[in-house]
Amino acid sequence: MTPQQSAQRLFQEKFNCTPTLNVYAPGRVNIIGEHTDYNDGFVMPCAINYGTAISGRKRDDSRFKVYAGDLQQWDEFDLAQEITPDSSKKWTGYVRGVVKFVQTHCPDFKCGADLVISGNVPLSAGLSSSASLEVAVGKFCQQLGNLPLTNTEIALIGQKAENQFVGCQCGNMDQLISALGQKDHLLMIDCRSLETIPTPIPANVAVMIVNSHVKHDLVAGEYNTRRQQCEVAAKFFGVKALRDVSLAQFKQREAELTALDPEVAKRARHVVTENQRVLDAVKALQSGNLALLGELMAQSHESMRDDFEITVPQIDYLVELAQIAIGKTGGARMTGGGFGGCIVAVAPVEKVEAVRQIIADNYAQQTGLKEDFYVCTASQGVSVC
């Protein structure tokens, strides 16, 4: 059963009536460009065929009554009163936060709703289950109140909710790709100007995701620490964000920054080189050069492992296994915020079984964890269904 079918069925079951509004927002996988979004840099994700559906209908009052189908939990809050976090149920922060900032953006939005949420994005896997939920809630509110919000604005409201209400200082990539994704395309996003360049995925190329089942929780601190270190580096270079530092400028002052703070220097090196890799990856894809894309993905993973220090041994092992099977016909790297989660692999379709097999034969035996393997389709962004 799809999330859309599940949400509609559950709504009928919980509220004894038919939903009048159904929305769906996808999760995402990032092919290259990690921890660059909050540095005003470049990223290249695609929306995937896993996401979050919301079914609901307008109420006569200002209350929101929400049922999370996958967690079998309820939440209730009132738009006529101040919306505050409920620390006992983490998921409610994403819903309440978005509704709160929709209200900030559109003060006349006061209509309540009954709604059911259902999703199939693996949780804490680095595939943006939270952004998918935020964008779905934003789109639901926009449709419910007939609000003058673009999909880009909905994405930025989702980011604001995660930053200021949930407490994770994420960038804007996850919400933007969930809102703006294009079927069969990767989307290069300039996270400062919000300009996007759609790049078609060649028909014979597969995007694979492997979930390590090492759980990460970005609110726990490491993510926010990395962001602070990047801000320190930007200040050192006298710029607004590390996006404004070229590779040549970085190399010119690298020794000086390393002497001051070797850890901050490593973080900056990752961001500066990763931005360039994204730009190079767009050209590689446009020319169908999968070997070059694979090299760039390998460099990205090494940089995340050695300079940004956000990988874990299980993730490094998955990347190593996938790369053995893929050879020079594509690439693999960790994807997402880090400290667990998933790897992404891009390779010709005929390599999929070899990648699946080498991981099935070795990963659990070596780590004691069982992976999940997905072949993904690049999908359309948020929609009313």
From Swiss-Prot:
Its EC number is 2.7.1.6. Its main location: cytoplasm. Pathway: Carbohydrate metabolism; galactose metabolism. The record marks R28 as: Transition state stabilizer. ATP binds at S124, A125, G126, L127, S128, S129, S130. InterPro entries: Galactokinase, Galactokinase_bac, Galactokinase_CS, GalKase_N, GHMP_kinase_C_dom, GHMP_kinase_C_sf, GHMP_kinase_N_dom, GHMP_knse_ATP-bd_CS. Mg(2+) binds at S130, E162. The keyword Lipid biosynthesis does not apply. Substrate binds at E34, H35, T36, D37, Y223. GO terms for molecular function: ATP binding; galactokinase activity; magnesium ion binding. Keywords: ATP-binding, Carbohydrate metabolism, Cytoplasm, Galactose metabolism, Kinase, Magnesium, Metal-binding, Nucleotide-binding, Transferase. Pfam families: GalKase_gal_bdg, GHMP_kinases_C, GHMP_kinases_N. SUPFAM superfamilies: GHMP Kinase, C-terminal domain, Ribosomal protein S5 domain 2-like. GO terms for cellular component: cytosol. GO terms for biological process: galactose metabolic process. It catalyses: alpha-D-galactose + ATP = alpha-D-galactose 1-phosphate + ADP + H(+). It is found in: Cytoplasm. The active site is at D174 (proton acceptor). NCBIfam families: gal_kin, PRK05101.1. Catalyzes the transfer of the gamma-phosphate of ATP to D-galactose to form alpha-D-galactose-1-phosphate (Gal-1-P). Belongs to the GHMP kinase family. GalK subfamily. This is Galactokinase. It comes from Pasteurella multocida (strain Pm70).
